[in-house]
Amino acid sequence: MLVQYGCYNARQSLCKIGTVTLMVELGIKFLLSYFIGSIMGSMVMGKLCGGVDIRTMGSGNPGGTNALRTQGGLFALGVVVIDVGKGLIAAGIIPGIELPIVGTDLEISRTWLTLNCAAASVIGHVWPMWHKFHGGKGASTLVGTLIILTPGLIACLLLVWLWVLVLSGYVGLATMIASLSAPVYLAVMRLPSDQPLFIYCAMFALYIVFTHRSNIRRMMDGAELRNSRLMFFRRRN
C-alpha cells in the first residue's frame, strides 16, 4: 500500500510539473509573439524616414493603406513587409524555439501552440503595448500567419481581395470579404480534418470585420475613400 501510494503521489507530482511546464511555454511564447506583433511597421518606417507618424495623417490608421495614401508606394511597401513579417515570425519561428530552463513540452499540440502564437501577433498588431494600444487593423499580420498555416489559401484570398477591390474600389471592404472567405473555403474544402485552422480563421474573420467597423460606418455614410483608379467598372465622364 505504501509503495502504491508513493507511486500515485509521484505520478500526481509529474502531472502537475507537466501542466506547469505546458502553461509556462504557452504563456512565454504567447507573450513573445504579442511583443513582436506590437512592433508597428509604420512606426519603424516613420523613424527611418525622419520621424514621420502617419497616425496624424489621412485616416489616422497606422496600416499599409493609410501609408500608401499619405507617404507613397515605397513607404507603404516597407510597412506591409514588416507587418506581414511579424505574422511569419510568430507562426513560423516562435513555436519551435526551445526555451531555456523550460524547454519544449512534447505534450503540447504543436498545431494549437502555433495558432496561439499566430493569434498573439495579430492581437499585438491591433493593440500594441509599445504604442499605447493604438494599432492597425490586423489584416497584414493575419496574412503573414496564414502564409505559414495554410499557404495554399493565400492565392484564393488574394483573388477575392482583388476582385472586390476592382469592383468596388474599397480596400477595407475587399479586406473584410477576403477574410470572411477564408473560413468559408476551409468549411467546404478542409473540414473536419482542419478544425483548429477553421476556428482560427473564423474567429479572425470576425475580428477583422470588427477592426474595420469605422470603415463600415463611413461606407454607409458615403464618406469612405474609394480608389477609383483600381475600379474596373467606374463611371466615365
Residue ranges and their predicted role:
Residues 17-29, 92-116, 147-154, 187-199:
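Helix-coil boundary and interhelical linker segments in multi-pass alpha-helical membrane proteins
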Residues 29, 33, 38, 42, ...:
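Alpha-helical transmembrane segments in multi-pass membrane proteins
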Residues 42-45, 123-134, 161-168, 213-215:
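C-terminal ends of transmembrane helices
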Residues 44-74, 135, 217-237:
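Cytosolic, membrane-interface loops and tails of multi-pass inner-membrane proteins
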Residues 52-64, 130-143, 170-178:
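Short, non-helical or kinked segments that cap or interrupt transmembrane helices
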Residues 155, 171-178, 193-204:
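Loop-to-transmembrane alpha-helix initiation sites
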